[in-house]
A protein has these predicted regions:
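Glycine/threonine-rich beta-strand-loop-alpha-helix active-site module
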Residues: 1-74
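Carboxylate- and glycine-rich phosphate/diphosphate-binding segment that chelates Mg2+/Mn2+
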Residues: 47-151
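Alpha-helix C-terminal capping segments
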Residues: 20-30, 150-152, 162-167, 186
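C-terminal charged capping/lid subdomain of soluble metabolic enzymes
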Residues: 204-282
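C-terminal catalytic subdomain
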Residues: 154-214, 220
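Glycine-rich phosphate/pyrophosphate-binding beta-alpha loops
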Residues: 39, 142-175, 256-261
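Flexible, glycine/charged-enriched surface loops at secondary-structure junctions
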Residues: 103-111, 125-136, 151-156, 209-212, ...
Length: 282
């Protein structure tokens, strides 16, 4: 295996696969990443997520970062609305979790804030078929990737990794379901930063408590506007199956490296509370 160049072309999973292949093969060939969806930011990150059976394995290493990223809006013209909704919420979640990370810093904060502001503004129009805004959303995805590659992510991604592998629900869709509940859970530790993001996106709120509420409600409203499921039950995970596996889910979430940079220390009860909010009714 002695390639002159490796090209990762596709969505987040395809790019992660190519990145892992290059990493484990030990090749010195440069890796060029060309994303065809606006979501993962994998074209600029040190992360790759691999799935084996019912487990997702997040890999983190600087050697996973591609040498070249190419953003071409032509790949976005014919994306189906459902895919735009799923991947777009991944952008929003990357930006929010990077901005509120316990490892956040000035430069990644600037990247994350701009990524969130742009994605929140552009996602509805992109979903509705406006191809002119899709490059802006594409760039927001890359900015969010640059931010979380430095700052890390949080509980929402940790839970999405575990639930996605177990119930085979698309990653971005899970983020959309989980994110408002995770914001409520993390609010005591990150209220001020959530409020800043709300104001950056034009959601207002003179007091931090009001701005945080506006952020959560704005995300719930956007989720509905994009025809995304509101609960795990609506996404196809039967509540009885979720509750039967709760112990295993909690254990796996606590072991996910994304928990290390959550703004608050992640505890067993916190994960259970989020699950209760997002599972849906029997």
């Amino acid at each position: 295996f002695q390639p002159d160049l490796l090209v990762a072309l596709g969505g987040g999973s395809a790019m992660d696969c190519a990145k892992a292949m290059a990493y484990f093969s030990g090749t010195k060939a440069p890796l060029a990443a060309i994303p065809t969806t606006s979501g993962s930011g994998s074209e600029v990150t040190d992360f790759a997520v691999l799935t084996h059976g019912q487990t997702k394995y997040p890999l983190v290493d600087k050697r996973l970062r591609p040498d070249l990223a190419i953003l071409d809006s032509d790949f976005l013209r014919n994306l189906p609305p459902a895919l735009i909704a799923d991947t777009g919420f991944d952008v929003l979640t990357h930006a929010i979790e990077a901005y509120t990370s316990s490892n956040a810093g000035t430069i990644p904060d600037l990247l994350a804030q701009e990524a969130f502001r742009t994605a929140y503004a552009c996602l509805p129009a992109s979903y509705a078929g406006n191809t002119e805004v899709r490059l802006r959303l594409h760039m927001a995805s890359t900015l969010a990737g640059m931010a979380f590659s430095q700052s890390g992510l949080g509980l929402c991604h940790a839970m999405a990794h575990v639930l996605g592998a177990r119930f085979h629900i698309p990653h971005g869709r899970l983020n959309a379901i989980l994110l408002p509940a995770v914001i409520s859970s993390n609010a005591p530790a990150a209220q001020q930063k959530y409020a800043r993001l709300a104001r950056a996106a034009g959601l207002g709120g003179s007091a931090d408590t009001i701005a945080l509420r506006n952020l959560k409600n704005g995300l719930i409203r956007l989720r509905k506007d994009l025809s995304l499921p509101q609960t795990l039950s609506q996404a196809g995970a039967a509540p009885a199956q979720v509750w039967a596996a709760t112990g295993e889910i909690v254990e796996a979430v606590l072991a996910d490296p994304c928990c290390k940079t959550n703004p608050a220390s992640v505890e067993d009860f916190q994960i259970r509370r989020v699950l209760e909010e997002v599972t849906g009714h029997f």
